[in-house]
């Protein structure tokens, strides 16, 4: 079973899906129709992408009459933030070790 950050990376790897998610982050809640109007794909494609985003926990839907509104769930990015922080710490440590080695080589 894939871990949380693998699911998020896989979900956000698609440029169209990532653009939809970014738009929801920047502009707030949107209907499928509003998202489709600015997307370069059909309404069924937008709906499919929203389904994948929802399954990954990145968006939430809210039904109002015949319309479905979607909003970004930024808390779902926590596993990516944690992973990125771990990797940043790992590489910073490696760069510090390399810097120490280069200083010793110059002496």
Question: What annotation goes with each model-predicted range?
Answer:
Residues 2-44, 64-82:
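N-terminal helix-turn-helix DNA-binding core of bacterial DNA-binding proteins
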Residues 3, 103-107:
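Generic C-terminal helix-cap and adjacent flexible tail
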Residues 37, 48, 54-55:
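Alpha-helical residues within the helix-turn-helix
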Residues 72-103:
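Conserved segment of winged-helix/HTH DNA-binding domains
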Residues 17, 46-49, 91:
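Generic structural signal for conserved hydrophobic packing positions in ordered secondary structure
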